[in-house]
Protein backbone atom coordinates (compact mmCIF):
# COMPACT_ATOMS: atom_id res chain seq x y z
CA UNK A 1 0.00 0.00 0.00
CA UNK A 2 1.22 3.48 -0.79
CA UNK A 3 2.32 5.81 2.00
CA UNK A 4 -0.57 8.21 1.41
CA UNK A 5 -3.05 5.37 1.26
CA UNK A 6 -4.94 6.78 -1.74
CA UNK A 7 -6.18 3.86 -3.86
CA UNK A 8 -4.69 5.07 -7.17
CA UNK A 9 -1.24 5.86 -5.75
CA UNK A 10 0.27 2.43 -6.41
CA UNK A 11 -0.89 2.54 -10.03
CA UNK A 12 0.52 6.03 -10.50
CA UNK A 13 3.86 4.73 -9.23
CA UNK A 14 3.81 1.78 -11.64
CA UNK A 15 2.91 4.04 -14.55
CA UNK A 16 5.84 6.35 -13.80
CA UNK A 17 8.43 3.57 -13.98
CA UNK A 18 7.53 1.12 -16.74
CA UNK A 19 10.04 -1.49 -17.92
CA UNK A 20 11.29 -1.16 -21.47
CA UNK A 21 12.08 -3.65 -24.24
CA UNK A 22 15.13 -5.90 -24.40
CA UNK A 23 17.54 -4.23 -26.82
CA UNK A 24 19.80 -7.28 -27.14
CA UNK A 25 16.94 -9.57 -28.08
CA UNK A 26 15.79 -7.05 -30.68
CA UNK A 27 19.25 -6.87 -32.25
CA UNK A 28 19.50 -10.67 -32.31
CA UNK A 29 16.13 -10.94 -34.03
CA UNK A 30 17.10 -8.40 -36.68
CA UNK A 31 20.37 -10.22 -37.31
CA UNK A 32 18.62 -13.56 -37.75
CA UNK A 33 15.98 -12.03 -40.02
CA UNK A 34 18.72 -10.78 -42.33
CA UNK A 35 19.89 -14.38 -42.84
CA UNK A 36 16.51 -15.98 -43.58
CA UNK A 37 15.71 -17.30 -47.06
CA UNK A 38 13.80 -14.26 -48.32
CA UNK A 39 14.54 -10.78 -49.58
CA UNK A 40 14.84 -8.15 -46.83
CA UNK A 41 11.39 -6.86 -45.88
CA UNK A 42 9.57 -9.47 -47.98
CA UNK A 43 7.38 -10.54 -45.06
CA UNK A 44 6.30 -6.97 -44.38
CA UNK A 45 4.67 -6.45 -41.00
CA UNK A 46 5.29 -10.07 -40.03
CA UNK A 47 8.94 -9.12 -39.63
CA UNK A 48 8.09 -6.14 -37.41
CA UNK A 49 5.79 -8.33 -35.33
CA UNK A 50 8.60 -10.84 -34.81
CA UNK A 51 10.93 -8.04 -33.72
CA UNK A 52 8.25 -6.74 -31.34
CA UNK A 53 7.85 -10.19 -29.80
CA UNK A 54 11.59 -10.58 -29.35
CA UNK A 55 11.99 -7.14 -27.80
CA UNK A 56 9.29 -7.67 -25.19
CA UNK A 57 9.80 -11.33 -24.35
CA UNK A 58 13.59 -11.08 -24.42
CA UNK A 59 13.99 -14.27 -26.44
CA UNK A 60 13.62 -15.75 -29.89
CA UNK A 61 10.06 -14.96 -31.04
CA UNK A 62 7.65 -17.68 -29.96
CA UNK A 63 4.01 -17.88 -28.91
CA UNK A 64 3.48 -20.93 -26.73
CA UNK A 65 0.79 -19.83 -24.28
CA UNK A 66 -1.51 -17.30 -25.95
CA UNK A 67 -4.45 -16.21 -23.82
CA UNK A 68 -7.66 -14.32 -24.51
CA UNK A 69 -8.96 -12.51 -21.42
CA UNK A 70 -12.54 -11.22 -21.55
CA UNK A 71 -13.77 -8.82 -18.89
CA UNK A 72 -17.53 -8.45 -18.43
CA UNK A 73 -19.25 -5.55 -16.69
CA UNK A 74 -22.62 -3.81 -16.50
CA UNK A 75 -23.37 -0.10 -16.69
CA UNK A 76 -25.89 2.15 -14.99
CA UNK A 77 -26.04 4.41 -18.02
CA UNK A 78 -28.14 1.80 -19.84
CA UNK A 79 -31.19 3.16 -18.01
CA UNK A 80 -30.91 6.19 -20.32
CA UNK A 81 -32.25 4.07 -23.19
CA UNK A 82 -29.02 4.02 -25.18
CA UNK A 83 -28.98 0.36 -26.26
CA UNK A 84 -31.56 -2.08 -27.68
CA UNK A 85 -30.41 -4.92 -25.38
CA UNK A 86 -31.07 -5.21 -21.62
CA UNK A 87 -28.13 -5.52 -19.20
CA UNK A 88 -29.14 -9.13 -18.49
CA UNK A 89 -27.59 -10.03 -21.84
CA UNK A 90 -24.12 -9.50 -20.34
CA UNK A 91 -24.63 -12.36 -17.87
CA UNK A 92 -26.25 -14.50 -20.55
CA UNK A 93 -23.24 -14.02 -22.81
CA UNK A 94 -20.84 -14.88 -19.99
CA UNK A 95 -22.77 -18.15 -19.66
CA UNK A 96 -22.53 -18.60 -23.43
CA UNK A 97 -18.74 -18.18 -23.22
CA UNK A 98 -18.63 -20.82 -20.49
CA UNK A 99 -20.71 -23.18 -22.62
CA UNK A 100 -18.47 -22.70 -25.66
CA UNK A 101 -21.19 -21.18 -27.82
CA UNK A 102 -19.84 -17.72 -28.66
CA UNK A 103 -17.79 -16.56 -31.63
CA UNK A 104 -14.72 -16.13 -29.44
CA UNK A 105 -14.87 -19.79 -28.42
CA UNK A 106 -14.70 -20.90 -32.04
CA UNK A 107 -11.78 -18.58 -32.82
CA UNK A 108 -9.89 -19.81 -29.75
CA UNK A 109 -10.36 -23.39 -30.90
CA UNK A 110 -9.29 -22.55 -34.45
CA UNK A 111 -6.10 -20.80 -33.32
CA UNK A 112 -5.35 -22.86 -30.19
CA UNK A 113 -5.76 -19.96 -27.77
CA UNK A 114 -6.52 -20.13 -24.07
CA UNK A 115 -9.61 -18.30 -22.80
CA UNK A 116 -10.45 -16.75 -19.44
CA UNK A 117 -13.64 -14.84 -18.68
CA UNK A 118 -13.84 -12.45 -15.73
CA UNK A 119 -17.30 -11.67 -14.35
CA UNK A 120 -17.06 -8.22 -12.75
CA UNK A 121 -19.96 -7.91 -10.28
CA UNK A 122 -22.61 -8.08 -12.99
CA UNK A 123 -25.43 -7.83 -10.46
CA UNK A 124 -24.14 -4.40 -9.41
CA UNK A 125 -24.02 -2.02 -12.39
CA UNK A 126 -21.74 0.99 -12.19
CA UNK A 127 -23.19 4.40 -11.46
CA UNK A 128 -25.04 6.15 -14.28
CA UNK A 129 -22.31 8.42 -15.64
CA UNK A 130 -24.88 11.05 -16.63
CA UNK A 131 -25.71 11.46 -12.92
CA UNK A 132 -22.67 10.33 -10.90
CA UNK A 133 -19.24 8.75 -11.13
CA UNK A 134 -19.19 5.21 -12.46
CA UNK A 135 -17.00 4.01 -9.60
CA UNK A 136 -15.40 5.22 -6.39
CA UNK A 137 -11.61 5.49 -6.46
CA UNK A 138 -11.37 2.51 -4.14
CA UNK A 139 -13.64 0.33 -6.29
CA UNK A 140 -11.88 1.38 -9.49
CA UNK A 141 -8.43 0.62 -8.06
CA UNK A 142 -9.62 -2.73 -6.71
CA UNK A 143 -10.98 -3.64 -10.14
CA UNK A 144 -7.69 -2.66 -11.79
CA UNK A 145 -5.90 -4.93 -9.32
CA UNK A 146 -8.32 -7.74 -10.11
CA UNK A 147 -7.64 -7.27 -13.82
CA UNK A 148 -3.93 -7.64 -13.17
CA UNK A 149 -4.63 -11.24 -12.15
CA UNK A 150 -5.36 -12.08 -15.80
CA UNK A 151 -1.72 -13.04 -16.30
CA UNK A 152 -1.43 -15.03 -13.06
CA UNK A 153 -1.63 -18.42 -14.77
CA UNK A 154 1.10 -17.52 -17.24
CA UNK A 155 0.93 -16.34 -20.84
CA UNK A 156 3.34 -15.09 -23.48
CA UNK A 157 0.71 -13.26 -25.58
CA UNK A 158 -2.30 -11.60 -23.96
CA UNK A 159 -5.39 -10.72 -26.00
CA UNK A 160 -7.64 -8.18 -24.28
CA UNK A 161 -11.42 -8.24 -24.85
CA UNK A 162 -14.69 -7.36 -23.14
CA UNK A 163 -18.42 -7.88 -22.87
CA UNK A 164 -20.84 -5.32 -21.47
CA UNK A 165 -24.16 -3.95 -22.65
CA UNK A 166 -23.78 -0.17 -22.86
CA UNK A 167 -20.01 -0.11 -22.96
CA UNK A 168 -19.61 1.54 -26.36
CA UNK A 169 -21.31 4.54 -24.72
CA UNK A 170 -18.67 4.36 -22.01
CA UNK A 171 -15.87 4.12 -24.58
CA UNK A 172 -17.26 7.11 -26.48
CA UNK A 173 -17.37 9.17 -23.28
CA UNK A 174 -13.75 8.30 -22.47
CA UNK A 175 -12.55 9.21 -25.96
CA UNK A 176 -14.55 12.43 -25.94
CA UNK A 177 -13.01 13.36 -22.58
CA UNK A 178 -9.48 12.49 -23.71
CA UNK A 179 -9.48 13.85 -27.25
CA UNK A 180 -12.29 16.37 -27.58
CA UNK A 181 -14.14 17.03 -30.81
CA UNK A 182 -17.86 16.42 -30.39
CA UNK A 183 -19.74 13.56 -28.77
CA UNK A 184 -21.13 12.68 -32.19
CA UNK A 185 -17.56 12.07 -33.42
CA UNK A 186 -17.19 9.22 -30.96
CA UNK A 187 -20.66 7.68 -30.68
CA UNK A 188 -21.63 4.82 -32.99
CA UNK A 189 -24.36 2.18 -33.16
CA UNK A 190 -22.72 -0.32 -30.80
CA UNK A 191 -25.12 -3.26 -30.59
CA UNK A 192 -27.61 -1.56 -32.89
CA UNK A 193 -28.56 1.90 -31.60
CA UNK A 194 -30.10 4.02 -34.34
CA UNK A 195 -32.53 6.89 -34.83
CA UNK A 196 -33.82 8.35 -31.57
CA UNK A 197 -31.89 5.79 -29.54
CA UNK A 198 -28.62 6.90 -31.15
CA UNK A 199 -29.49 10.52 -30.36
CA UNK A 200 -30.08 9.54 -26.72
CA UNK A 201 -26.69 7.86 -26.71
CA UNK A 202 -25.02 11.02 -28.02
CA UNK A 203 -26.89 13.13 -25.46
CA UNK A 204 -25.82 10.80 -22.65
CA UNK A 205 -22.16 11.14 -23.61
CA UNK A 206 -22.46 14.93 -23.81
CA UNK A 207 -24.18 15.11 -20.42
CA UNK A 208 -21.69 12.78 -18.74
CA UNK A 209 -18.61 14.63 -19.94
CA UNK A 210 -20.16 17.97 -18.98
CA UNK A 211 -21.07 16.68 -15.51
CA UNK A 212 -17.55 15.46 -14.76
CA UNK A 213 -15.75 18.19 -16.71
CA UNK A 214 -13.91 19.67 -13.73
CA UNK A 215 -12.14 16.35 -13.05
CA UNK A 216 -11.06 15.23 -16.51
CA UNK A 217 -7.46 16.42 -16.49
CA UNK A 218 -6.41 13.15 -14.78
CA UNK A 219 -6.66 9.97 -16.90
CA UNK A 220 -7.37 7.75 -13.89
CA UNK A 221 -10.18 10.07 -12.85
CA UNK A 222 -11.59 9.85 -16.38
CA UNK A 223 -11.56 6.07 -16.02
CA UNK A 224 -13.34 5.96 -12.67
CA UNK A 225 -15.88 8.68 -13.48
CA UNK A 226 -16.74 7.76 -17.08
CA UNK A 227 -15.54 4.18 -17.35
CA UNK A 228 -16.68 0.85 -16.01
CA UNK A 229 -15.39 -2.26 -14.32
CA UNK A 230 -14.30 -3.88 -17.57
CA UNK A 231 -12.43 -0.69 -18.51
CA UNK A 232 -10.57 -0.68 -15.19
CA UNK A 233 -9.86 -4.41 -15.34
CA UNK A 234 -8.55 -4.21 -18.91
CA UNK A 235 -6.30 -1.30 -17.94
CA UNK A 236 -5.01 -3.36 -15.03
CA UNK A 237 -4.36 -6.37 -17.24
CA UNK A 238 -2.47 -4.30 -19.82
CA UNK A 239 -0.39 -2.72 -17.06
CA UNK A 240 0.37 -6.07 -15.42
CA UNK A 241 1.48 -7.46 -18.77
CA UNK A 242 3.84 -4.51 -19.18
CA UNK A 243 5.41 -5.10 -15.78
CA UNK A 244 6.13 -8.70 -16.85
CA UNK A 245 7.09 -7.73 -20.43
CA UNK A 246 4.25 -9.75 -21.93
CA UNK A 247 3.15 -8.63 -25.43
CA UNK A 248 -0.50 -7.58 -25.67
CA UNK A 249 -3.07 -7.52 -28.48
CA UNK A 250 -5.89 -5.05 -27.92
CA UNK A 251 -9.30 -5.77 -29.40
CA UNK A 252 -11.96 -3.26 -30.42
CA UNK A 253 -13.39 0.14 -29.55
CA UNK A 254 -13.99 -0.52 -25.86
CA UNK A 255 -10.65 -2.24 -25.21
CA UNK A 256 -8.91 0.58 -27.05
CA UNK A 257 -10.57 3.09 -24.71
CA UNK A 258 -9.11 1.25 -21.73
CA UNK A 259 -5.69 1.32 -23.37
CA UNK A 260 -6.07 5.04 -24.07
CA UNK A 261 -6.31 5.74 -20.33
CA UNK A 262 -2.85 4.25 -19.82
CA UNK A 263 -1.41 6.07 -22.83
CA UNK A 264 -2.72 9.36 -21.44
CA UNK A 265 -1.03 8.60 -18.11
CA UNK A 266 2.31 7.66 -19.71
CA UNK A 267 3.00 8.11 -23.45
CA UNK A 268 5.08 4.89 -23.53
CA UNK A 269 2.50 2.76 -21.70
CA UNK A 270 1.35 0.90 -24.83
CA UNK A 271 4.73 0.18 -26.40
CA UNK A 272 4.21 -3.52 -25.62
CA UNK A 273 0.79 -3.50 -27.33
CA UNK A 274 -0.51 -3.89 -30.86
CA UNK A 275 -4.08 -3.19 -31.97
CA UNK A 276 -5.58 -6.43 -33.25
CA UNK A 277 -8.09 -4.90 -35.63
CA UNK A 278 -10.04 -1.79 -36.52
CA UNK A 279 -13.70 -2.44 -35.88
CA UNK A 280 -16.78 -1.25 -37.70
CA UNK A 281 -17.55 1.15 -34.84
CA UNK A 282 -17.10 4.60 -36.45
CA UNK A 283 -14.87 6.10 -33.75
CA UNK A 284 -12.44 3.20 -33.53
CA UNK A 285 -10.08 4.15 -36.35
CA UNK A 286 -9.79 7.69 -35.02
CA UNK A 287 -9.10 6.35 -31.53
CA UNK A 288 -6.37 4.06 -32.89
CA UNK A 289 -4.82 6.98 -34.75
CA UNK A 290 -4.78 9.00 -31.53
CA UNK A 291 -2.71 6.20 -30.00
CA UNK A 292 -0.26 6.30 -32.91
CA UNK A 293 -1.01 2.69 -33.80
CA UNK A 294 -1.84 0.76 -36.98
CA UNK A 295 -4.27 -2.16 -36.65
CA UNK A 296 -3.30 -5.60 -37.91
CA UNK A 297 -6.71 -6.43 -39.40
CA UNK A 298 -9.69 -4.60 -40.90
CA UNK A 299 -12.57 -7.04 -41.30
CA UNK A 300 -15.52 -4.80 -40.49
CA UNK A 301 -16.15 -6.66 -37.24
CA UNK A 302 -17.82 -4.97 -34.26
CA UNK A 303 -18.64 -7.84 -31.94
CA UNK A 304 -16.22 -7.34 -29.09
CA UNK A 305 -15.48 -10.45 -27.00
CA UNK A 306 -11.80 -10.14 -27.94
CA UNK A 307 -12.59 -11.61 -31.37
CA UNK A 308 -10.45 -9.19 -33.39
CA UNK A 309 -7.48 -9.57 -31.05
CA UNK A 310 -7.86 -13.35 -31.15
CA UNK A 311 -7.82 -13.39 -34.95
CA UNK A 312 -4.73 -11.18 -34.88
CA UNK A 313 -3.09 -13.69 -32.54
CA UNK A 314 -3.04 -16.10 -35.46
CA UNK A 315 -0.98 -13.59 -37.42
CA UNK A 316 1.38 -13.09 -34.48
CA UNK A 317 1.82 -16.85 -34.15
CA UNK A 318 2.62 -17.06 -37.86
CA UNK A 319 5.15 -14.24 -37.56
CA UNK A 320 6.93 -16.06 -34.75
CA UNK A 321 6.85 -19.36 -36.65
CA UNK A 322 8.34 -17.82 -39.78
CA UNK A 323 11.11 -16.10 -37.85
CA UNK A 324 12.02 -19.15 -35.79
CA UNK A 325 11.36 -21.92 -38.29
CA UNK A 326 12.62 -20.63 -41.62
CA UNK A 327 16.02 -21.78 -42.79
CA UNK A 328 18.90 -19.37 -43.20
CA UNK A 329 20.59 -19.03 -46.58
CA UNK A 330 23.50 -21.09 -45.25
CA UNK A 331 21.28 -23.85 -43.89
CA UNK A 332 19.26 -24.13 -47.08
CA UNK A 333 22.19 -23.83 -49.46
CA UNK A 334 20.49 -20.86 -51.12
CA UNK A 335 22.64 -18.07 -52.50
CA UNK A 336 22.19 -14.74 -50.73
CA UNK A 337 22.28 -11.44 -52.60
CA UNK A 338 25.71 -10.14 -53.57
Swiss-Prot record:
- Reaction catalysed by this enzyme: 5,6-dimethylbenzimidazole + nicotinate beta-D-ribonucleotide = alpha-ribazole 5'-phosphate + nicotinate + H(+)
- EC no. given is 2.4.2.21
The record's keywords, sorted A to Z, are:
Cobalamin biosynthesis, Glycosyltransferase, Transferase
Q: Does the keyword Translocase apply?
A: no
- Pathway linked to the protein: Nucleoside biosynthesis; alpha-ribazole biosynthesis; alpha-ribazole from 5,6-dimethylbenzimidazole: step 1/2
Question: Which cysteines in this chain are paired by disulphide bridges?
Answer: none
A Gene Ontology biological process noted in the UniProt record is: cobalamin biosynthetic process
The catalytic site is made up of 305 (proton acceptor)
Q: Kindly give the Pfam families that the UniProt entry links to this protein.
A: DBI_PRT
- What family does the database annotate? Belongs to the CobT family.
Could you tell me what this protein is called? Answer: Nicotinate-nucleotide--dimethylbenzimidazole phosphoribosyltransferase
The beginning of the lineage is: Bacteria, Pseudomonadati, Pseudomonadota, Alphaproteobacteria, Hyphomicrobiales
Instruction: Write the gene name.
Output: cobT
